[in-house]
Amino acid sequence: MSSHNPHSESPFNALPPVVVFLALAIAGVEIGLQLGQRGLLGGPEAVGWRLGLIQRFSVVPDLFRAMWAQGIWPPEHLLRLVAYPFVHASFGHAIFVIVFILALGKMVAEVFAAWAVLVVYFGASAVAGLVYSFVVPS
């Protein structure tokens, strides 16, 4: 006779810690923005935090084209390639991203080591940002 009790099973699949870390990082940014938007964090200027983060960390094709043309790569602009995945246009946008990170990240993390998952995540983000910069018409 088996001692397996189906009522004690978790309804969720176990998630690798690196995937949980990425999802919590995205959720943390979004929670901070939501609290600021509601006036519960950061004072009156917090209402504009999302727009400020988008302006500071979004991938701007004209900016990257100009950097390419001049051969100048300021670190504060290169940071955009790995920072933009943590800033989203809205709460709904962030939720969709978190769901996909949890689902797809679990599959990737089952095959790769934690450090490799981070390389895939940030590498894909950087490559996607550069491709976007040079494919989008000016």
What is each stretch, according to the model?
Residues 1-40:
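C-terminal transmembrane module of polytopic alpha-helical membrane proteins
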Residues 30-138:
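N-terminal TM1-TM2 helical hairpin plus the immediately adjacent luminal interfacial "cap"
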